[in-house]
């Protein structure tokens, strides 16, 4: 089967935004204008197509990044059809993982900002993730029809708060109630969309006389930005020659692809204005799969030889599974992005991460939660496979004869855990199944059984994250659960170096004995310097401990790291140097050396100034001005460190660093302090030493 759309006409994009910037409505309008959706779904009444999980419709926030395919031929039908694959990304901070994983498979992104609220704290988190994956992006300033809307103010914030280089592609004509359309700064024409057909048709008109000077000024700014793309254009521009529309667009595209500028458009998705021109900007300025660098990976040759795959049907098949979802009708759906090659339904592919073969039974392309079955997918496509057996988010799927392991995604460690138990004993097994499935979908969510209490523990990125997991168990798997009090994921570490710590395990009374003897140094590592948080150096000279026992020493220490001597929390940032010891020809064994190492570790840890580490959260609170004092006072009582504040149209944004243990129930407290007018977001920042009184209380509570 031949390719229907050339790969250069593909656009794999994400639509990313702060909560309430109107991202879902914007996506809905895109689906409407691209002809997929005949009736526009409004988030206000819970009917939007992209928000397909029930909780999202209730909470009015987008949780799961659904992938949707649409076609666009331009507002004035000026292009060949372009295939736009849209990945919807959530804006809530507890779902940062969803944003992260979608950024990994995008080629470009549209950042949606609210014309009133501007660049919010959450927008900065998303921006950092887009920077990390070097995603070219454009911005859409939405809600121009709202009270207090100000397009150029938001352009200024993109520069000051995100450190970006924004270049307006349009200007808003009017604002609030008087918002009627936009000025196209490339064509230097006003665009007015027709209300009667929900903005499907439009007219080019002259720029309003009272905006001519402003339009000239920003047109000049746009031309200068374009001219900076090459010396040739700069000479032409400085020589007083006019740049053609084609030259301007080509130059701006090049600068967007190089991540040098952010083109900014505006509109009101709700009022059917501006989304159509933003779609044109997606086609004109965002990359196709062939415009972005080839994807990197390593060969499965035992040497980790670097390799890459280019976006071409002729290269061997390679894809990345970026999301696992459970569908009530077909079971497991594995969303994947094809980077190279072609795969047909019925083909067998390899998952090199698990060394397992998988058969692609049915392949579907998703439109929000409706699906269309297809026979093949090619380089650049995003699709979902039904019924793959053992694939986790971040796994590679590739041609078994040309094995490559694509770069893995990085997932954050959970910072909060709670115990859960089913309301009825009969549901125990069902709960285990449900949690196992949900953990497969979401790598930032973990499940395990506490060995001492035998309770099931679930852990995630925040209270909302775990609330939604419990909620999904009830809705999707019919399992009602009771939940315990949230627990903080503390860590243990040392702050001093200790040397010549001895560990000896000797039992030599009759029969075959046991003998292991080690001497180690222990020292703290710089936090984050070692991805494993642990290093082991073997400095044994002259065979005082035979080589075959060295791994047992390492293993003996690693087993102790799982539950530290202070309060039973994992030990991090620790280095160990093994430099002396002794053995017995007959009585020594791996087990004896493992035990000797654990004795030395426990002794050394106590002497090396052990500390309890607690997770510190970056907290940002947006509050009306009159409540600022109360909010700051409350954060200080929670051991918060103030890191600054700034005013905006809607009030004051307070930046603070607060221990997670002090943030439980914060949403309720903030609501009562500000009569429900404040909002906050928090994300994990770092681990830091817990003060003595806090550490003492935690240690006593653990009964250590």
UniProtKB/Swiss-Prot annotation:
Keyword Cytoplasm: yes
Subcellular location: Cytoplasm
PANTHER family: RIBOSOME-RELEASING FACTOR 2, MITOCHONDRIAL, TRANSLATION ELONGATION FACTOR G-RELATED
Organism (species): Pectobacterium carotovorum subsp. carotovorum (strain PC1)
InterPro entries: EFG_II, EFG_III, EFG_III/V, EFG_IV, EFG_V, EFG_V-like, EFTu-like_2, G_TR_CS
Keyword Lipoprotein carried by entry: no
Domain of life according to the entry: Bacteria
Record: residues binding GTP: 17-24, 88-92, 142-145
Xref: HAMAP family: EF_G_EF_2_B
PROSITE patterns: G_TR_1, G_TR_2
One example of a Gene Ontology biological process annotation: ribosome disassembly
SMART domains in the cross-refs: EFG_C, EFG_IV
Recorded name of the encoding gene: fusA
Name of the protein in question: Elongation factor G
Alphabetized UniProt keyword annotations: Cytoplasm, Elongation factor, GTP-binding, Nucleotide-binding, Protein biosynthesis
GO MF annotations, alphabetized: GTP binding; GTPase activity; guanosine tetraphosphate binding; translation elongation factor activity
Family per similarity comment: Belongs to the TRAFAC class translation factor GTPase superfamily. Classic translation factor GTPase family. EF-G/EF-2 subfamily.
Start and end residues of each tr-type G domain: 8-290
Pfam families, sorted: EFG_C, EFG_III, EFG_IV, GTP_EFTU, GTP_EFTU_D2
GO cellular component, one term: cytoplasm
Chain's role: Catalyzes the GTP-dependent ribosomal translocation step during translation elongation. During this step, the ribosome changes from the pre-translocational (PRE) to the post-translocational (POST) state as the newly formed A-site-bound peptidyl-tRNA and P-site-bound deacylated tRNA move to the P and E sites, respectively. Catalyzes the coordinated movement of the two tRNA molecules, the mRNA and conformational changes in the ribosome.
